[in-house]
Amino acid sequence: MAAPGAGDPLNAKNGNAPFAQRIDPSREKLTPAQLQFMRQVQLAQWQKTLPQRRTRNIMTGLGIGALVLAIYGYTFYSVAQERFLDELEDEAKAARARALERERASGP
């Protein structure tokens, strides 16, 4: 129950509180004082949420950067471990050597 003399906390006619009523600036013409107050409240809300948003953005950036570095490092590791082309070159050299030996053996 409200304190005595505090007034009716709810407007009995429309059920809205007498404060913080929603308005649509496109429908209602606002006074310069109302526009200034809206800007002031928006600025206060923005300043209140700025540190949290900045922290979240930094954490997201660090996470994406860590992912990029992990992929980059894994790529180098994977390429360094790859011996497929080396083995292929060794087989090609051995095949050329066998072909030369066959050519010499069957030669004149």
From Swiss-Prot:
Keywords annotated in UniProt: Acetylation, Coiled coil, Membrane, Mitochondrion, Mitochondrion inner membrane, Transmembrane, Transmembrane helix
Mitochondrial matrix side: 2-57
UniProt keyword annotation of Transmembrane present: yes
Pfam families named in the record: Coa3_cc
Localization per Swiss-Prot or TrEMBL: Mitochondrion inner membrane
Residue spans, topological domain Mitochondrial intermembrane: 81-108
Domain of life assignment: Eukaryota
Residue ranges of the TM segments: 58-80
The UniProt record lists the keyword Acetylation: yes
Coiled coil region boundaries: 78-106
Annotated membrane topology: Single-pass membrane protein
GO cellular component, one term: mitochondrial inner membrane
Main subcellular location of this protein, as a coarse class: mitochondrion
Region (Disordered): 1-25
Any Gene Ontology biological process: mitochondrial cytochrome c oxidase assembly
Quaternary assembly: Along with COX14, core component of the MITRAC (mitochondrial translation regulation assembly intermediate of cytochrome c oxidase complex) complex. Interacts with MT-CO1/COX1, SMIM20, SURF1 and TIMM21.
Family recorded in the similarity comment: Belongs to the COA3 family.
Its biological purpose: Core component of the MITRAC (mitochondrial translation regulation assembly intermediate of cytochrome c oxidase complex) complex, that regulates cytochrome c oxidase assembly. MITRAC complexes regulate both translation of mitochondrial encoded components and assembly of nuclear-encoded components imported in mitochondrion. Required for efficient translation of MT-CO1 and mitochondrial respiratory chain complex IV assembly.
Protein name stated in the entry: Cytochrome c oxidase assembly factor 3 homolog, mitochondrial
